[in-house]
Amino acid sequence: MRAADPGPAVVLVTGVMASGKSTVAQALAERLPRAVHVRGDVFRRMVVSGRAEMVPGAYEEAAAQLRLRYRLSAMTAGAYAGEGWTAVAQDVVLGEELAAYVELVRTRPLYVVVLAPEPRVVAEREAGRGKSGYGAGWTVEALDRVLREETPRIGLWLDTTG
């Protein structure tokens, strides 16, 4: 089934790890007539050496690299939208960084979709995945707290518990 063409736009799909961002963003992009899926994690993986991982209480270098990743993602999505595409950007953008990301995207319209399943469901999904998003100091509960208590209510928030 094809979705109506929103025309050139940026759609940011965000949420905690294992909330369904990749699945939702890919499914949305596949249903649009002219769309790209901008995966924020690709920019993180481009760093070959010197990468500083974002963990609780991260050093300034990790935060700077995260903000660079967001800038690159926003610029890439905006460039595609500027050429007539619907750019579906997907990344973990939480807390005060969500408002900052919205400011980075110059293209309008910009749609923000926040996936917010219950923590127990996130833990179940994480356990069933081939990759691990948690660890290195993050727990499902800690990241869920950042989502629900520190992230501004921008865009459409969806409980994707199922």
Question: What residue spans do the PLM features occupy?
Answer:
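Conserved phosphate-donor/acceptor-positioning beta-strand/loop module used by diverse small-molecule
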Residues: 91, 106-126, 158
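Walker A/P-loop
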Residues: 22
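P-loop (Walker A) phosphate-binding loop of NTP-binding proteins
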Residues: 16
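Conserved substrate/cofactor phosphate-moiety recognition/catalytic segment
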Residues: 26-72
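Hydrophobic anchor at the beta1->P-loop junction of P-loop NTPases
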Residues: 13
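ATP-binding Walker
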Residues: 19
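Glycine-rich phosphate-binding loop used to anchor ATP phosphates in small-molecule kinases
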Residues: 64-111
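Small-molecule kinase domains that catalyze NTP-dependent phosphoryl transfer to phosphate-bearing small molecules
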Residues: 128-162
